[in-house]
Amino acid sequence: NPEKVSLSNEKISLSFHSKGGSLVSAKILGEQTYQNRFLEDSSQKADLDLVYSDSASMNLEFYHNNQRIESKNLYFSVAKATSQTLVLRAYTNDSAGYIQWSYSLDANSYALKVDLSFVGLETVIDRGQSDIPLIWSQIAPRQELNLSNERATSTIYYKTESGSVSRIGRGGENSEEIEEAVEWISFKQQFFFNSLIFKNGQFKRPVQAQTQLPGWADSSVNLAYNAFLSVPYGYSSASSVSMEWIFAPLHFQTLASMNMGLEEQIDLGYIGLFSLINRYLVIPVFNFFDQLGLGYGIIILLLTLIIKVLLSPLNFKMFVSSAKIRLLKPELDELNAKFKPDEALKKQQAVMQLYRQAGVNPLAGCLPMLVQMPFLLAMFSFFPSAIELRQQGFLWAEDLSTYDSILNLPFEIPFYGSHVSLFTLLMTATTILYTHLNSSQMQTGANMQQMKIMMYIMPIVFLGVLNSYSAGLNYYYFLSNVVSILIYLAIRYLFIDENKLRLKMEAHKAKPQKKSKWMQRLEDAQRMREQQVKQQSAPKNRQGRRKN
């Protein structure tokens, strides 16, 4: 009769079925799904299972007398079973040969050691099969509150013999044929994964990896995974393959310590700079405060302050530049009134001359913004991927890894969703306030008005985009805005004396003016543009005279 046999240690609990001899359940101990996390009855809090309803299989295919044999249909008997060791065998009809799966689990480890052996099958398996196909299949259950985001971050990762780690498309139906030999292949979910690793070699090429939504899939299912692999077979009396099967959370330090590149599955940003910021600044700082036992809301606040302190010299320069432009506003308004709309180039030259006389670099305020952008975008990757925030509450947010809903709507608003995230509202409100403070110092004119409109539209766009994102991310953006507003007010009213700054600008006007290389290039570009406009308008004027 079919039976299940289990192995477990302090971290994982694994179940195997005698039919097929492969794993059918993999539980991460101490972790729960979003549904079980908040159950009042602790006895009902089942550990999180990476496999949906015994849906996993590890199927070997080979031929005997030109008939295909699939190991998933064979019944394996238990040859040895302890709390951390299991040996399963499927015998031939005469019991002279067998396929053997040997599993062993060390204490306090996420790794299952796997040995696949073919014993006495050299006359059973038809000649011509130097490799035995191994089809690894699994359906992953839903684990998180936001199913669409969970599916969008679920995929198959793999490491090739060249050492590069790649993935197929994320979410839904994706397929890829990998033309290199593969060292490991991993079925990744949003915060957890299980990875099959070939020890002392690689799975031979080609390897096919695919994900899809089962036709019957409902809200309890994430994705179905399939990997078409092969293992070597030498037609000897005893042929074996050693593998390792890891079932673990996507925790950066834990995976990095394994030295196999498994941490590359964690999305820290596609652009190298974003990934570097997360690897060498954000994660070390985050882990340092985590080891002190601080709450994650406080850790995010401290992380925000540290980043703001690092950027404070640039921010100070930006605010000084903004203050200078604000003091020049009356003169800039005069120039706007002086020149007609068709004299844009002349007006621009006059503005540049005014800036040069006052010692103002109009691009000085842009550099700090450009420097801050990589940090903002790095956080966009870090917070939704940080398993430390999973099911960790703060204030009204029950789980900082997903959205914080203060109101569930009975309908869905296009581009917004069917819930209201308070942290997203706070982020949007403070972004608009900070935008207002900055835009009040901008120049006037048609182009500036269009830019101001865009600056106010962007927070509204983010309101829709980020409403279903991590509460931790929106909380960080909210704190970043609040700190920026406080820094702005402090610098403007406490650290910058506008009267002294005005006197300094007047003194600069009295000095002989030497054009900087940048200003000279800008004026040269303006003159070239003016000449191009004249050349383009000249033929039109001649045509007009001919008609007259």
Predicted regions and their residues:
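Soluble non-transmembrane domains of integral membrane proteins
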Residues: N1-E264
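Helix-loop-helix
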Residues: F16, V114-S117, Q143-N149, K199, ...
